From Swiss-Prot:
Keywords, comma-separated and alphabetical: Endoplasmic reticulum, Hydrolase, Membrane, Transmembrane, Transmembrane helix
Gene designation per UniProt: SAC8
Organism: Arabidopsis thaliana
Positions of the SAC domain: 129-455
Family matches, as PANTHER family: PHOSPHATIDYLINOSITIDE PHOSPHATASE SAC1, PHOSPHOINOSITIDE PHOSPHATASE SAC8
Free-text comment about domains: The phosphatase catalytic core motif (or RXNCXDCLDRTN motif) from the SAC domain is found in metal-independent protein phosphatases and inositol polyphosphate phosphatases.
UniProt keyword Membrane, yes or no: yes
The organism's taxonomic lineage, starting at the top: Eukaryota, Viridiplantae, Streptophyta, Embryophyta, Tracheophyta
Listed Basic and acidic residues bias regions: 40-50
Name listed for the protein in its UniProt record: Phosphoinositide phosphatase SAC8
Localization in the cell: Endoplasmic reticulum membrane
Length: 588
C-alpha cells in the first residue's frame, strides 16, 4: 500500500515566472511555460495562456513559487502568490516548504466607479489582506498532500495519490480552500497548492545504533478559525475553536510509527470578550442547542478517529471551574466518550512537569489500548491507532502542549520497546542528547501553534524543553503574557476579520448601506483617556509629594486624585467599547 506519491503521475509545478503587463498578469511554469495562464487586471478573469497570448513587453518580471488562489472584494479580484519559500524538511521522504512571503496582487478597476463608502470599505478590506500576507505557520508540498495523517493515507484506495493535489486534500485543513474556486473552475490542477496552517518540526536522533527521524506535523482546522479571545468554544455545527490535529511520526529501522492527538476549545457555546481587564470574565451562553452542539462535535471525532478520551486540563475553581463543570455535565450525556478532569495548575503548578504522572495513572491503560499506527519497510500495516486523546485547557495552548508532549514521550517509549531498540528499563530520556532534541521539537511546535491563535509564543515552554521552569523562561512567559494582553485588546479585532475573510465565513458583496459594523470609539477616545490617566497619575504623585507645604497643595492633590479615579472608572465601565473588535461576523 502506497504511503507517498513517489510514483504518482501527478505533480504540481514548483517555480513560476510572473509577468506583469498593464492589462494582465501572466503566470508561466518555468519547466512548462506553454502551460501558463493569465489573469485580467480589469476584471480578474482567468484564461489559459494559449487563449490569451501575451503581446508587448511586461512592465515587471519576477519569480514566484506558487499561486494561493483568488479572492473577490468590492473593487474586484486579488490574486495571491507565494513570493518566497523555505525548505524545512521531508514529510515521508518528500520535501516540505514553509511560506516566508506572499502577496495579494490587485486585478480590478471597479474602484473608480465606487461610492465614497465603498472606497472606505475597500480600504479596510485591503488592510485585512495586508494582515493575511504575514500569516505565520503556512506549509505546502509540491509532491504530497500534507493534510492527511499516515494512517488515513495508508487506508485509501490505490491510486488516490494520482488525483490532483486539491482533490487529495482534506478541506478542513486547507488554509486557502476558499481561495481555490476560480482555479478549480478553470481546471488549473497543476497550479493549485493546498496550503496547510500549523507546524512541522523534525529532529534526527541517534538512539544507540538505530538512527531515527522524529517529526511533528500539526494541522489547524479552518472551520472555526480565529484569534484567542474572539473565537472560543464551538459553533452550532459543533466545530471547535483552535482545533489542531498533531501527528508524531517516528521513522526508524524501516518502520514508521504515527501517534495522533487532537486539541480544541471546550465545545460549548461560550465567550470571553475583551474589556481591558487582564482576565475577562467567561460567559456560558444558555442555548437550547448546546447538547446537540456537543454531540455533533464528538460524533465527528468518533467518525474520524475511533474512541475518544476527552482530557480537560482547566482549573476547578472560578470561571474556569464553572465552565469545566458545565462541560462535565454535558459529557455525562455521552456514555461512549470518556471524560477526565485534571486540574493541571493544582497538581503540576508552574514547575512540576513530572506530576503529569498522576494523570497518566488515570488514563495510561486506555491510552495504551488506543495504541499507535505502525507500518513496516514493506508498507504492511502492523498496528492501527484505535482512538485519540482530545486535550483542552482554556486556550488549548500552554497546558495542552505540555500534556501532549508528555503523552508523545510515553508513546515513543512504547514504540522503541516494541521494535527492540530499548528494553523495558530504558526510555527516550535515557539518551540525553536525543531527549533534548525530542523535547525541543515539541516546544517549538507549541510556540508555532500558539503564535497563530494568541499572537505570542506558548507559555510554560520550559516545562516542555527542560522539564522545569527557568528564570529566563519565567521572564519570557511574563513578556508573552503582556504581549497577549496588548494584542487581544488592541489588535485582534482586525486579525479576526482577516481570518473570517480568508476562511469564507464572510463574503464581500456590494451592499448599500455598508454592512461593516462601526469601528466604535477606540481610535479617538482611547488615546485621550490613556493620556489623562498617565497625566493624572503623574500629577497626583507629584502633588502628594508636595502636599505638606500648604492647604492648596492638599486640594490640588485631592483634585488630581479624583480626576485619575474618574478616568479609571470610566475606562473600566467602557472597556469593551475601547478594544479592537471584529466588524465582519458574530461570535458564533
Amino acid at each position: 500500500m502506497e504511503i507517498a506519491p513517489s510514483t504518482s503521475r501527478f505533480k504540481l509545478y514548483d517555480q513560476f515566472e510572473l509577468l506583469e503587463f498593464p492589462d494582465k498578469y501572466v503566470v508561466k511554469p518555468i519547466e512548462s511555460p506553454e502551460e501558463g495562464f493569465s489573469v485580467n487586471r480589469r476584471d480578474g478573469n482567468i484564461k489559459p495562456l494559449d487563449e490569451n497570448a501575451s503581446s508587448g513587453s511586461p512592465t515587471r518580471v519576477s519569480t514566484i513559487y506558487g499561486v494561493g488562489g483568488t479572492i473577490r472584494l468590492l473593487a474586484g479580484t486579488y490574486l495571491l502568490v507565494i513570493t518566497s519559500r523555505e525548505e524545512v524538511g521531508n514529510f515521508l521522504g518528500l520535501p516540505i516548504f514553509r511560506v516566508t512571503a506572499m502577496k495579494f496582487l490587485p486585478c480590478n478597476e471597479a474602484l473608480r466607479f465606487a461610492t465614497a463608502q465603498e472606497k472606505k470599505d475597500e480600504t479596510y478590506f485591503r488592510t485585512l489582506l495586508q494582515a493575511l500576507e504575514t500569516t505565520p505557520g503556512l506549509y505546502f508540498s509540491y509532491e504530497t498532500d500534507l493534510t492527511l495523517n499516515l494512517q488515513r493515507r495508508c487506508k485509501l484506495a490505490e491510486g488516490w495519490n494520482r488525483k490532483p493535489m486539491w482533490k487529495q486534500a482534506d478541506p478542513r485543513y486547507v488554509w486557502n480552500w476558499h481561495l481555490l474556486e476560480d482555479l478549480i473552475e478553470c481546471k488549473l490542477d497543476g497550479f493549485i497548492i493546498p496550503i496547510l496552517q500549523g507546524s512541522y518540526q523534525v529532529a534526527e536522533l541517534k538512539l544507540k545504533n538505530s538512527p531515527a527521524v522524529v517529526s511533528i506535523m500539526s494541522r489547524r482546522c479552518t472551520r472555526r478559525l480565529g484569534t484567542r479571545m474572539w473565537r472560543r468554544g464551538a459553533n452550532l455545527e459543533g466545530d471547535a475553536a483552535n482545533f489542531v490535529e498533531s501527528e508524531q511520526i517516528v521513522e526508524i529501522n524501516g518502520f514508521k510509527f504515527s501517534l495522533l492527538q487532537v486539541r480544541g476549545s471546550i465545545p460549548l457555546l461560550w465567550e470571553q470578550i475583551v474589556d481591558l481587564s487582564y482576565k475577562p470574565r467567561l460567559k456560558i451562553n444558555k442555548h437550547e442547542e448546546t447538547p446537540k452542539v456537543v454531540q455533533r462535535h464528538f460524533h465527528d471525532l468518533c467518525q474520524r478517529y475511533g474512541e475518544i478520551m476527552a482530557v480537560d486540563l482547566t482549573d476547578q475553581h472560578g470561571d474556569e471551574g464553572a465552565l469545566s463543570k458545565a462541560y462535565a455535565t454535558e459529557m455525562e450525556k455521552l456514555p461512549d466518550v470518556r471524560y477526565v478532569s485534571f486540574d493541571f495548575h493544582q497538581v503540576c503548578g508552574t514547575t512540576n512537569f513530572d506530576n503529569l504522572g498522576v494523570l497518566y495513572e488515570q488514563i495510561g491503560d486506555e491510552f495504551e489500548k488506543q495504541g499507535y499506527f505502525l507500518v513496516d519497510a514493506d508498507e504492511n500495516i502492523l498496528e492501527e491507532q484505535k482512538g485519540v486523546i482530545r486535550s483542552n485547557c482554556i486556550d488549548c495552548l500552554d497546558r495542552t502542549n505540555v500534556t501532549q508532549s508528555f503523552m508523545g514521550q510515553k508513546s515513543l517509549n512504547l514504540q522503541l520497546q516494541r521494535i527492540g531498540v530499548c528494553d523495558s528499563t530504558e526510555c527516550i530520556s535515557t539518551f540525553e542528547d536525543d531527549y533534548t532534541k525530542f523535547r525541543t521539537i515539541w516546544a517549538e511546535q507549541g510556540d508555532e501553534v500558539s503564535l497563530q491563535y494568541a499572537g505570542t509564543y506558548a507559555l510554560k515552554g520550559d516545562l516542555v524543553r527542560y522539564g522545569k521552569q527557568t528564570m529566563t523562561g519565567a521572564i519570557k512567559d511574563g513578556l508573552s503574557a503582556m504581549s497577549r494582553y496588548y494584542l487581544n485588546n488592541f489588535q485582534d479585532g482586525v486579525r479576526q476579520d482577516a481570518l473570517d475573510l480568508i476562511s469564507g465565513r464572510y463574503t464581500v458583496g456590494t451592499h448599500s448601506p455598508s454592512q461593516l459594523q462601526p469601528i466604535g470609539s477606540q481610535p479617538s477616545f482611547l488615546p485621550v483617556a490613556s493620556a489623562l490617566l498617565i497625566g493624572g497619575v503623574t500629577v497626583t504623585s507629584f502633588t502628594i509629594h508636595q502636599a505638606g507645604r500648604n492647604t492648596q497643595q492638599y486640594l490640588a492633590s485631592a483634585l488630581w486624585a479624583g480626576v485619575t479615579a474618574g478616568v479609571v472608572a470610566m475606562i473600566k465601565a467602557n472597556g469593551r467599547h475601547l478594544t479592537s473588535r471584529p466588524r465582519l461576523c458574530h461570535l458564533i
